[in-house]
Amino acid sequence: MASDTPESLMALCTDFCLRNLDGTLGYLLDKETLRLHPDIFLPSEICDRLVNEYVELVNAACNFEPHESFFSLFSDPRSTRLTRIHLREDLVQDQDLEAIRKQDLVELYLTNCEKLSAKSLQTLRSFSHTLVSLSLFGCTNIFYEEENPGGCEDEYLVNPTCQVLVKDFTFEGFSRLRFLNLGRMIDWVPVESLLRPLNSLAALDLSGIQTSDAAFLTQWKDSLVSLVLYNMDLSDDHIRVIVQLHKLRHLDISRDRLSSYYKFKLTREVLSLFVQKLGNLMSLDISGHMILENCSISKMEEEAGQTSIEPSKSSIIPFRALKRPLQFLGLFENSLCRLTHIPAYKVSGDKNEEQVLNAIEAYTEHRPEITSRAINLLFDIARIERCNQLLRALKLVITALKCHKYDRNIQVTGSAALFYLTNSEYRSEQSVKLRRQVIQVVLNGMESYQEVTVQRNCCLTLCNFSIPEELEFQYRRVNELLLSILNPTRQDESIQRIAVHLCNALVCQVDNDHKEAVGKMGFVVTMLKLIQKKLLDKTCDQVMEFSWSALWNITDETPDNCEMFLNFNGMKLFLDCLKEFPEKQELHRNMLGLLGNVAEVKELRPQLMTSQFISVFSNLLESKADGIEVSYNACGVLSHIMFDGPEAWGVCEPQREEVEERMWAAIQSWDINSRRNINYRSFEPILRLLPQGISPVSQHWATWALYNLVSVYPDKYCPLLIKEGGMPLLRDIIKMATARQETKEMARKVIEHCSNFKEENMDTSR
């Protein structure tokens, strides 16, 4: 079962401070520059958390705006101490690192910070005496500086600049540096000379860097415990160097199988060398490699029985010489992952759910190209089979979507996987907190990636949630995104259909403040434009019907939205739809329901008082469409118009008396036990028609409506009628001289129903 644990006080305080920087930690010096309050001192635990959480909020939160001078809060180590920070994406620029250059950083991770230039290399020197861990993964421009080819020093003259590779920077002076990640650097960075000054490297990541001569790695053969050479084109020479690094505990020579043609194949001899020469090895990743058949035993030879991780039983022959099982073995898109006996506690691969989840976990941060394919496999598992590690799967997909907000493949596969992982089959296993995280990343995807497949997947995933309840915490944002999707210039019918359905659900069963806010966002106008487009195409489909239904819901007891409907030619569209689609019963019901809402607004009723409109409403009294619904709603519209009295009847034809007679006839033709396709949140608009004598037919319609609802749905509507004070009003009708006898009889029956209901449900326990 799912359980919700509250956020820690530290997490809540951090979030609040970051969202209110100039009201908590700092103040604005000149309307834009942040400064820390002079009486504040923050230790490293708090400062590190503030910076790392800030980066997370900028990259993952929808409603969080980065502050240009945020890093200036940490410029003075006498009041703030930074030690371990992780920065990513375009958020970080040269001036941000410059702002914190006086800090004694121990750990600095810069991931895909493409806006950093060679200026930041000089800033890095400021941390040289304290830095132990440094990652420059994906910072592809940090070894470039701009050069003015004209040699002109006047910065106001327009001269094009070109980027020049910095070749004289080295890690000279970084005496404490032990962990270094240079993954995804450009190929022509002189890695060997760059690294030569580092005497005691323990971990090195050269992912994606090509070097034909790896002999320089041997200078750390007595210290290097982790080496990552992902997507490096290997040769026998590389292998000869690697096996000299006898202290290695983690070796990653995996590759992206789809990246390029690759001649090197892992042989039985190479794997045997790793086992023999690298005796401390605990983790090995050979994902994506072609493996020669002589590396494994045949299916026929594999030992029967339960799978084993004991090296002696290994289906991979060279690994039988291992002293103990590996902690991790990367075999994603590698034929060895399908063997039965693999000597490792954790295996990444594509054979089963466990291997696929291990792959997503291992590769998400730095290898989106691999992660997207692993998530695609998870999608198939969730779609065709059953996901047995649901919570782990959901958390991993959420992390991947947060981490790679602008990666199309991740967004497509991740949003598709979420659709299956959040469906009703798995619902009881998910906490409110986790489901909210899903909603956040889905909305992030819709916001960041305007692509048809992503948008469709995200909309479908939102359909798995209880609407509007589960989306209420992001109510405004989700409506804005859906309305942008419904822009009529977009032609994708399937997305339109899902988005209109969601919009309709979002404005159903919410309070009037929400409806008014959504109306001001352009909801009413957007729906009318969709209807207009469908009319031009002479098409009455789900989009058309959902659009009218959404308008019916959003105008319920919301006068501003009703007025908007009238102001933007809503009545013309109503008449045109009625004429173009005379047989569409569902459409007629939705349109008349909406007009019932408009008619409830006294100030707007004069706009309905035209011969054309009154004639249309009168004719619809005889409609048998959708049971009694169209006739009932048409009568409701006319009841409110009649309620304004004879003096408000501003048309000669049809005459008021004639319409009144048709209304009486229609009401008498309805079956009082009719099941209804309607949902009243309040009886207030009906109840206001009871205490009056100016229009007995309106009073009768209102009484009939109450009698029908309390008869057919007593559990729902008896308490509502009692709560809203309907009983005294009905008793007054019985005493009224102007009320018709049949109306009085009906009022008595309503009172009787509600009285019986109260007695039956009275609690007599002691």
Curated annotation (Swiss-Prot):
InterPro entries membership: ARM-like (IPR011989), ARM-type_fold (IPR016024), Armadillo (IPR000225), LRR_dom_sf (IPR032675), LRR_Zer-1 (IPR056845), ZER1-like_C (IPR055142), Zyg-11_UBL_adapter (IPR051341)
Disulfide bridge partners, by residue number: none
SUPFAM superfamilies (UniProt xref): ARM repeat (SSF48371), RNI-like (SSF52047)
Stretch forming the signal peptide: none
Subunit structure: Interacts with the ELOC-ELOB/Elongin BC complex. Part of an E3 ubiquitin ligase complex including ZER1, CUL2 and Elongin BC.
Function: Serves as substrate adapter subunit in the E3 ubiquitin ligase complex ZYG11B-CUL2-Elongin BC. Acts to target substrates bearing N-terminal degrons for proteasomal degradation with the first four residues of substrates being the key recognition elements. Involved in the clearance of proteolytic fragments generated by caspase cleavage during apoptosis since N-terminal glycine degrons are strongly enriched at caspase cleavage sites. Also important in the quality control of protein N-myristoylation in which N-terminal glycine degrons are conditionally exposed after a failure of N-myristoylation.
Family per similarity comment: Belongs to the zyg-11 family.
Protein name: Protein zer-1 homolog
Annotated source species: Homo sapiens (Human)
